[in-house]
Amino acid sequence: MLKLVQYIAPRVGGATPRPTACGWGNLLLISPRSGASSEKCITQRRHFLFSSASSSGTFASSSSLCTEQRQQFHGSRRNRETILFPSTYSSLQAQSQRAFRDSSKPDSDDYVDSIPKAEQRTRTRKSLFNDPDERTEEIKIEGVMAPHDRDFGHSGRGGRGGDRGGDDRRGGGGGGNRFGGGGGGGDYHGIRNGRVEKRRDDRGGGNRFGGGGGFGDRRGGGGGGSQDLPMRPVDFSNLAPFKKNFYQEHPNVANRSPYEVQRYREEQEITVRGQVPNPIQDFSEVHLPDYVMKEIRRQGYKAPTAIQAQGWPIAMSGSNFVGIAKTGSGKTLGYILPAIVHINNQQPLQRGDGPIALVLAPTRELAQQIQQVATEFGSSSYVRNTCVFGGAPKGGQMRDLQRGCEIVIATPGRLIDFLSAGSTNLKRCTYLVLDEADRMLDMGFEPQIRKIVSQIRPDRQTLMWSATWPKEVKQLAEDFLGNYIQINIGSLELSANHNIRQVVDVCDEFSKEEKLKTLLSDIYDTSESPGKIIIFVETKRRVDNLVRFIRSFGVRCGAIHGDKSQSERDFVLREFRSGKSNILVATDVAARGLDVDGIKYVINFDYPQNSEDYIHRIGRTGRSNTKGTSFAFFTKNNAKQAKALVDVLREANQEINPALENLARNSRYDGGGGRSRYGGGGGGGRFGGGGFKKGSLSNGRGFGGGGGGGGEGRHSRFD
């Protein structure tokens, strides 16, 4: 045993060997200090020494230990065993692994002896993670500030779902109320320039989209709070005029009778509100510049989609408007081409100017997809663009902003960082786009959006795009757009793309892997070119497990989830787009904004928490009027979603599995909590979780603490 420790010890502390102790059953193994002249001291590491299950554990040490070392552990240190030593054997392996990684931390004796004895007596055995499904434990010592302790200062955690009548700031206040507050964000402790810093950047409580504590900097569960970042005030008293009406109605469009216009709108399922120009029916009728038309012809577009046919005349006339359309309807071109025309009719950017057109998107994948379209159609007219999002280095993004770009595509959080730092400004912005506004509100970005819009001149042109039209999006449109035009493509009710064949398999949880294997075998056996396949699951761990399962059969497979770095995501998407890997396993980060040609199949290995996410997942196929197929494994654990799924299938004229109908009839659930705007839900996510049951008061997890229990979820669209 001693040889084992002697072998391990030099490899734990880096280049300089350090004495190391390790628990092995009921034994305490201690390595000598390699190269030291004396063995009169021993290093005691936090989370590293282990006792037996009883508080008075039995220790057997090497004969090489000196008297002082034995006294340290059997004498004066006996009172600390119950504090520093875990009392159970169940976490031995996890803690020993953590200890080897933490070998560079200060010696535990020095760490503890520096605490006044009065404070040592007040130590507690609270662990960082009390939830049974967590793998590691931390020991909290009052008076010692650790970067990851559960209680940080005076307002350590957001609360654990807490009392319904409690303080919103400490969780629980939102219980029973769909718009209730969540837990407050804990103080953030970090290390910078060798010093411990403490700040409170945001508070998860108070947001109307469920609960959610924050972990310091912008990591709130559920709705999360707004960032409390300083913004420079903007003076709008002396604004230079600008032009925003560039639309010239084509004679063919002007000469169409009201009957012809109405018939076309009915065929395309277009409904309008307000004074709306007639729709175009051909690219030649919109008077786009030659360089834009050349790119349209090069990419093989034959006719505008419904959202483009009706949206381009509105956007190019300078009007504010809201477009409600399902995924894959061509809305990106619906605002990018008018943006290019708008930019080319403005004064050139000067040094220090910000963008002329700003596009806000909820996710980095969608932002990158928008940038690709902007580059394809803007490069011929030298319209520069940049994409600003979190998860990537700031340096290159900052340089692009400082050099000047006519179009900036951004996620709200990263853009606020640059605005607060003075890296860019929005004084020249006259064309604003909010893409997937409903998704941004679901993700709790409303405070950030309002802060950004407050920096833009009020006479701007604003275009808002959404897949649904709930009252939260409607309120945002009324606040930002004023007198606006609204167009809807298809039904206002949430509905699936009718070009997608939907198959639902009601099965047991344990049989899903075998069913996936059979399904993939059938797809590959029945087609020489199976196309691309996306498999959606609920958790990051399951993504990794499923990728290993698929690769075990010799099939190339990529993975995307929130813990992947931006370079990893980019590599996986390049492989997927090029066809080198035609299977992608992902969480919901790929459910929106991922526009990849050739996706023929979408498989819902785990059914999502609500039908809105299901519709957006399967919307990755069947895009641009192509056909696609979706499969869903539906278990009894998803029974509360059965009624909503049956409604989605029935609206799309799909065949309904009798077992699913039986679940829908017998389900005792009615709506459920949910994590989106259609119900409350505790603070979701890894950094401040809560449950999704009705009025759940389930514990918050992770670093922020959970918000209060959500509402009863009676607002579900499919109740």
From Swiss-Prot:
Phenotypic consequence of gene deletion: No phenotype under normal conditions. Upon infection with Rift Valley fever virus (RVFV) or La Crosse virus (LACV), knockdown flies exhibit increased mortality. No phenotype upon infection with other viruses, including vesicular stomatitis virus (VSV), Sindbis virus (SINV), nor Drosophila C virus (DCV).
UniProt entry keywords in alphabetical sequence: Antiviral defense, ATP-binding, Cytoplasm, Helicase, Hydrolase, Immunity, mRNA processing, mRNA splicing, Nucleotide-binding, Nucleus, RNA-binding, RNA-mediated gene silencing, Translation regulation
Motif Q motif, chain ranges: 281-309
Pfam families: DEAD, Helicase_C
PROSITE patterns in alphabetical order: DEAD_ATP_HELICASE, HELICASE_ATP_BIND_1, HELICASE_CTER, Q_MOTIF
Enzyme Commission number(s) from the entry: 3.6.4.13
Annotated Helicase ATP-binding domain residues: 312-487
Motif extent (DEAD box): 435-438
GO cellular component, one term: catalytic step 2 spliceosome
Subcellular location(s) of the protein: Nucleus; Nucleus, Nucleolus; Cytoplasm, Cytosol
SUPFAM superfamilies given in the database record: P-loop containing nucleoside triphosphate hydrolases
Top EC class of this enzyme: hydrolase
GO biological process: alternative mRNA splicing, via spliceosome; defense response to virus; immune system process; mRNA splicing, via spliceosome; regulation of alternative mRNA splicing, via spliceosome; regulation of defense response to virus; regulation of translation; regulatory ncRNA-mediated post-transcriptional gene silencing
Region of interest (Disordered), residue spans: 94-234, 689-719
Record keyword Cell membrane present: no
Bias kind Basic and acidic residues: ranges: 99-108, 137-171, 194-205
Occurrences of domain Helicase C-terminal (ranges): 519-664
Catalysed reactions listed for this entry: ATP + H2O = ADP + phosphate + H(+)
Keyword Transcription: no
A GO molecular-function descriptor: ATP binding
Record-listed ATP binding positions: 325-332
Assembly: Interacts with Fmr1 to form the RNA-induced silencing complex (RISC), a ribonucleoprotein (RNP) complex involved in translation regulation, other components of the complex are RpL5, RpL11, AGO2 and Dcr-1.
Protein name: ATP-dependent RNA helicase p62
Gene name linked to the record: Rm62
